[in-house]
């Protein structure tokens, strides 16, 4: 009997934002795969899912190198594939946890592609994205009527972000942690900084909220889990 792989989005931080289905499957799992980096111990996704994990479940941390080198990344994905397949071949139910939604800026997508043609059943359970949680948490409408919404990673080239914000009415900027000064500059240029909001680690105990990004110090230190919502004032 072959096992089954579940990709589960645990949402942005609050365990109660996990879907009923996600919580049930986590509670029934034989194996839970928790992605981690080489530099950090622990897993935010695992902590979010923890209230639903049963004693019989085995937790298996898998390292995914946070590097730009394609060969090193591929090596990490292949190792994850090997580990997951070893459990699936034993008939185990395997859960791969991911923050937010599994198909939105997630490591799970790469593992999914490697395993989808191996003959094993896969089911992906959606989760609440950080930007949707922030909009609801702060009462900040993300996009309205015929407005155009842009979703961009702050890690993209500056000129690419600039071009996108030039035509967008509203913006979601993900992964704001290393280059806040460049992002801030671009938001100011396109008249989107004054009413912008940013949350680091939304739904977690150490959540930080920033309202109005035009006057924030350029050297502000931010967590990797930081997201900006912005609107153009002249439209």
Whereabouts are the PLM-identified features?
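Solvent-exposed alpha-helices and their adjacent loops that cap or buttress functional pockets
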Residues: 1-2, 24-25, 88-89, 96, ...
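A polyampholytic, Gly/Pro-enriched intrinsically disordered region
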Residues: 79-87, 142-153, 215-226
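Short gly/pro/ser/thr-enriched loop/turn and capping motifs at secondary-structure boundaries
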Residues: 39-42, 67, 129-132, 180, ...
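Class I S-adenosyl-L-methionine
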Residues: 1-15, 20-22, 27-120, 209-210, ...
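Class I SAM-dependent methyltransferase SAM-binding "motif I" and its flanking Rossmann-like core
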Residues: 103-167, 233
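A contiguous loop/helix-start segment that scaffolds small-molecule binding in enzyme catalytic cores
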Residues: 5, 165-235
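General beta-strand structural signal in soluble alpha/beta enzymes
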Residues: 34, 61, 96-98, 124-127, ...
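Cofactor-binding loop segments of dinucleotide-utilizing enzymes, especially the Rossmann-like FAD-
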Residues: 37, 99, 154, 176, ...
């Amino acid at each position: 009997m072959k096992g089954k792989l579940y990709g589960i989005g645990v949402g942005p931080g609050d365990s109660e934002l996990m879907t009923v289905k996600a919580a049930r499957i986590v509670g029934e799992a034989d194996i839970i795969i928790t992605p981690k980096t080489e530099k950090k111990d622990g897993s935010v996704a695992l902590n979010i899912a923890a209230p639903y994990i049963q004693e019989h479940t085995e937790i298996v941390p898998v390292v995914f190198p946070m590097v730009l080198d394609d060969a090193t990344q591929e090596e990490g994905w292949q190792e994850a594939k090997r580990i997951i397949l070893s459990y699936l071949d034993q008939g185990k139910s395997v859960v791969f946890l991911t923050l937010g939604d599994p198909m939105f800026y997630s490591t799970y997508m790469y593992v999914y592609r490697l395993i989808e043609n191996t003959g094993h059943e896969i089911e992906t359970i959606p989760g609440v994205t950080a930007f949707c949680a922030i909009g609801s948490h702060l009462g900040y409408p993300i996009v309205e009527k015929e407005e155009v919404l842009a979703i961009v990673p702050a890690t993209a080239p500056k000129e690419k972000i600039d071009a996108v914000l030039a035509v967008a009415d509203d913006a979601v900027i993900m992964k704001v942690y290393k280059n806040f000064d460049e992002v801030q500059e671009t938001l100011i240029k396109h008249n989107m900084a004054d009413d912008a909001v940013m949350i680091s680690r939304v739904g977690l105990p150490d959540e930080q909220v920033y309202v109005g990004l035009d006057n924030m110090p350029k050297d502000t230190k931010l967590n990797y889990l930081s997201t900006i919502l912005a609107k153009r004032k002249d439209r």
